[in-house]
Amino acid sequence: MAKELKELTPRSESYSQWYQDLVIKADLAENSAVRGCMVIKPYGYAIWEKMQRQLDDMFKETGHVNAYFPLFIPKSFLSREAEHVEGFAKECAVVTHYRLKANPDGDGVVVDPQAKLEEELIVRPTSETIIWNTYKNWIQSHRDLPILCNQWANVVRWEMRTRLFLRTAEFLWQEGHTAHATKEEAEEEARRMLEVYATFAEEYMAMPVVKGVKSANERFAGAVDTYTIEALMQDGKALQSGTSHFLGQNFAKAFNVTFADKDGNRDFVWATSWGVSTRLMGALIMSHSDDNGLVLPPKLAPYQVVIVPIYRNEEQLAQIDEKATQIIQALRAKGISVKYDNSDNKKPGWKFAEYELKGVPVRLAMGARDLENNTIEIARRDTLTKETVGLDGIEETVATLLDDIQKNIFQKALNYRKEHTITVDSYEEFKEKIEDGGFILAHWDGTSETEERIKAETKATIRCIPLNGDMTPGKCMVTGKPSPQRVLFARAY
């Protein structure tokens, strides 16, 4: 049974199938009856909740508050900002009617043609338009600024090719929308939130990221600048893991949102928006997991420790239960989340396989001999190693181990990125090396034409212009024209 539970397609055989197998078998999510939409199962949602809780704390620490805005957006709102509507038009789900009626043939229900909406409603693909229409009523003076709002919501983008967590027609996310009196304040906010995302990715997800600015071709529709964090997955593909946009005055002008400054002069408000989504779940899975299942960083694991009793009879189980209760109390007192699995419908071997598959960072196993010796077996998921340790001070042992696992997972991912990041100077070398995957740093002349040619010929895109990258000027690898710095290329999800 344990073997059957864990049978995953090896990554070396098919990375895509391995990912699909893992999401399903680890009970994270499954496909639904609605094309392109997923059911996030309790274990998967528990991970998302931990992400959500931590990010929400970080937002509030930087002065943000939560609000909620409508799911439906009048179609005319989307037309106000030309670049914005062009960027999202092909992905919009549109509500045209508000009522069903019984089918005259007696077979189910049909759309009532008499219930057509005067103006169609868009199911939000993102909320800039509805929020800036609202902000118009909130802002009159510089005293009303800044507004620092975040929203936790679902959005719909009618994707044609979907994959669980990575690209679905409906997904969960947070979107921050802020309003400022000056350009400098708004730019500072956009960069601040990029730092929040980078800190979360590295310190909680244990996922190293490159911070940078998107090229004009890759920029968010309607933004002046898009800041991004880019991560490298184990198959050598990049994953955009969070974006923060400096919107300038574009949306304020589209919705006529002005304010009176300290001198009484009226000006348009400056704006940002920023967001991460359940796509981070896909990033987490692909950054660390292996052919045995999930590998979760302790800071985001639904439970950090599982205790499995090994016994031959009810008397032994009762004794282990008593000792386990003491261990659980000690661990919880240290802020460590723990599950005790003394269910009798599965054998210990099956449980070991299940918790390995689910990526529980630390497994404790206790049998009759451990009771006699005051010991316990401790196994770590990241290295698949185990040892027997004394029970005295077990909470300190486990706390230290969890810290070490968090650091080790990050270091392993960082080492992978370093080993798969190269610098090239010629387009011929670029075309050869991009086939191996990974990040490539190369010079680019800054034109959309060159960027589009590279994408068409190699399927690689500019992931970002790194903020802390190699600032040595050079010549574009394609055209030979001057280039101020190297940019980051990769094939991407």
UniProtKB/Swiss-Prot annotation:
One of its GO terms (cellular component) is aminoacyl-tRNA synthetase multienzyme complex. Consists of three domains: the N-terminal catalytic domain, the anticodon-binding domain and the C-terminal extension. It comes from the Bacteria. Keywords: Aminoacyl-tRNA synthetase, ATP-binding, Cytoplasm, Ligase, Nucleotide-binding, Protein biosynthesis. Its EC number is 6.1.1.15. Catalyzes the attachment of proline to tRNA(Pro) in a two-step reaction: proline is first activated by ATP to form Pro-AMP and then transferred to the acceptor end of tRNA(Pro). Its main location: cytoplasm. This is Proline--tRNA ligase. Belongs to the class-II aminoacyl-tRNA synthetase family. ProS type 3 subfamily. The keyword Ribosomal protein does not apply. The lineage of its organism: Bacteria, Pseudomonadati, Bacteroidota, Bacteroidia, Bacteroidales. It comes from Porphyromonas gingivalis (strain ATCC 33277 / DSM 20709 / CIP 103683 / JCM 12257 / NCTC 11834 / 2561).
